[in-house]
């Protein structure tokens, strides 16, 4: 249902970024979603890389351009360019390493400093399959997400649990906001937003108003 399509066969192009500490599984989340692949020998990402995948929202094809960068301090110089134009983000921590959750607040600040105030953000607790090593409760993370007005989901890139759901939910929310704004303006969403054009997701009220289950299919 629209999972893997021709490169130019899409109605919308949304830039989504992955952020969070090094070693939390960002690269494996990306490879699991875009290639259904998982690497047990996943080294820290050097520089920046991105991958794409298209999904279907209503009768439209939404192409996600998902960017991945290492969470290590020495790559901080690329942040401005990395975040520029992003309309969605997955902020990832490792449920077995509390320090990665403690750093979420700093990553969130950096994300908001470098993007539009209304970017759609999903807090992601990865490595949920390591139940016996869990250091952050679901309740603690959920409370943080509610306080910061972000979405929240726990995933396992290893077991392919909730990975598609996390990415699809972010894309769904972006699509809904963009469609709603185009309709309010009296425009056809597709013609109003040519391929490759920067998407402005509008006011925060729009974001909070559409926090409902996703409508898109992977």
Curated annotation (Swiss-Prot):
GO annotation, cellular component aspect: plasma membrane
Native source organism of the sequence: Arabidopsis thaliana (Mouse-ear cress)
Binding site for GTP: 20-27, 68-72, 126-129, 156-157
Domain of life of the organism encoding this protein: Eukaryota
GO BP, sorted A to Z: cell wall biogenesis; protein transport
Record-linked NCBIfam families: small_GTP (TIGR00231)
Single annotated GO MF: GTPase activity
Family: Belongs to the small GTPase superfamily. Rab family.
UniProt entry tagged with the keyword Nucleotide-binding: yes
UniProt KW Magnesium keyword: no
SMART domains tied to this protein: RAB, RAN, RAS, RHO
Membrane topology designation: Lipid-anchor
UniProt short sequence motif Effector region, positions renumbered to this chain: 42-50
Lipidated sites in chain (S-geranylgeranyl cysteine): 215-216
One Pfam family matching this protein: Ras
Name of the molecule in the record: Ras-related protein RABA1i
Keywords (A to Z) from UniProt: Cell membrane, GTP-binding, Lipoprotein, Membrane, Nucleotide-binding, Prenylation, Protein transport, Transport
Stated role: Intracellular vesicle trafficking and protein transport.
């Amino acid at each position: 249902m629209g999972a893997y399509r021709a490169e130019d066969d899409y109605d919308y192009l949304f830039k989504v970024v992955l952020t969070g500490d090094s070693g939390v599984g960002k690269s494996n989340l990306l490879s699991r979603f875009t290639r259904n692949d998982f690497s047990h020998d996943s080294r820290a990402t050097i520089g920046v890389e991105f991958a794409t995948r298209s999904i279907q929202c209503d009768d439209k094809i939404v192409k996600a351009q998902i960017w991945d960068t290492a969470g290590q301090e020495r790559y901080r110089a690329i942040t401005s360019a990395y975040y520029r134009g992003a309309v969605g983000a997955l902020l990832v921590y490792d449920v077995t390493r509390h320090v990665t959750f403690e750093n979420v607040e700093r990553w969130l600040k950096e994300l908001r400093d470098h993007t539009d105030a209304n970017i759609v953000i999903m807090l992601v607790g990865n490595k949920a399959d390591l139940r016996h090593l869990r250091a952050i409760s679901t309740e603690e993370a959920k409370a943080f997400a509610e306080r910061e007005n972000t979405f929240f989901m726990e995933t396992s890139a290893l077991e392919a649990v909730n990975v598609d759901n996390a990415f699809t939910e972010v894309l769904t929310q972006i699509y809904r906001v963009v469609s709603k704004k185009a309709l309010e303006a009296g425009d056809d969403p597709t013609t109003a937003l040519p391929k490759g054009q920067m998407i402005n997701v509008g006011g925060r009220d729009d974001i909070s108003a559409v926090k409902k289950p996703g409508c898109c299919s992977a």
